[in-house]
Regions:
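Cytosolic regulatory regions built on CNB/CRP/Popeye-like sensor folds
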Residues: 1-163
């Protein structure tokens, strides 16, 4: 094929996915397969993407915009856990268990998100087990990094309280 290796312009979806550590070592073919499973969602500033204790359906990747992750039920009792921007992802624990959400996710600007949901991961596991395992393995690595960061923060906080 004379077009083999020809560099077509990538979709915005693939450009965004390439920024996400979970998909860091994917081939173009794997990105094409993954792109078929992605759901596009749009939120206005102030919209809840999900609420604490709601059923978890999957993870979201920020293509454009910003999102804050909070705990607490009222505006004046809200603790911001994270402020996220383009290329960041959240809600990934829903891909591993059936537990309800442990926080709120709220758009802080008009936002375009990519959704990757549990049912799509399950279907991918059946159709292409190698790619499904690659996603889960990479997600596990990211979760491990986040847990280490949380542990270090906890140790630092405890050290500051002792002093």
């Amino acid at each position: 094929n004379i077009f083999k290796g020809w560099n077509r312009s990538e979709s915005r979806t693939v450009v965004t996915l390439k920024q996400v550590p979970v998909f860091k070592d994917f081939s173009q073919k794997e990105f094409s397969e993954l792109e078929k499973l992605i759901h596009h969602r749009n939120y206005s500033s102030g919209d809840y993407i999900f609420k604490n204790r709601a059923p978890g359906e999957g993870m979201y990747i920020i293509m454009h915009g910003s999102v804050k992750i909070t705990i607490g039920t009222r505006e004046n009792n809200e603790n911001v856990l994270a402020e996220l921007g383009e290329g960041d992802f959240f809600g990934e624990l829903a891909l591993f268990d059936d537990e309800p959400r442990s926080a709120n996710a709220i758009a802080t600007s008009d936002s375009d998100l990519l959704g990757f949901f549990t049912q799509d991961l399950m279907a991918l596991q059946e159709r292409n087990p190698v790619l499904g395992q690659k996603i889960l393995f990479n997600l596990g690595g990211v979760l491990g990094e986040r847990l280490r960061g949380t542990n270090n923060l906890l140790i630092q906080t405890q050290s500051n309280n002792i002093e």
